[in-house]
Amino acid sequence: MALKLGATVVPTDHFATWTDPVSWWPRLVAEVLDPLRHGRDAHYRRVEWPGGLPRLGDLVHVPVPDVLIIEGVSAARRSIAPHLDEAIWVEVPDPAERLRRAVERDGEASRAHLRRWQAFERGWFAVDGTKDRADRIVTPD
């Protein structure tokens, strides 16, 4: 979708850690959303995982885009909803399939963390009502 739209993508994975899945949001707002909203390029340090431990890593430059996609869990959270042009919910209904895909992406060593993450997601989405506010629901192949 990003390629088709010529969009810039900022993944929430660049901010979240296993132990801090959502409270990093003010950093995303201050370092990315506020500058872009005011027509200025944005810069942020992405979370990197040397030796399996999170730390702030390389500086990422985000020029003012025509289309910005914030991708990941909590990207369409209730607090940002009034500022979104569109919220897209990506639906993979089977939890085992979601886990399989995530382990394929992140490696077998991440399986236990991913299971805890999925439990967090279920609770987050239930409280936040994210899917109910989505403008579009898509199911990947």
Feature locations, PLM:
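Conserved beta-strand scaffold positions in the cores of enzyme catalytic domains, especially
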Residues: 7-9, 87-89, 137
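Conserved nucleotide-sensing/catalytic segment adjacent to the nucleotide-binding pocket
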Residues: 8-70
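Small-molecule kinase domains that catalyze NTP-dependent phosphoryl transfer to phosphate-bearing small molecules
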Residues: 77, 107-141
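ATP-dependent NMP and nucleoside kinases share a basic, alpha-helical "lid"
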Residues: 54, 58-105
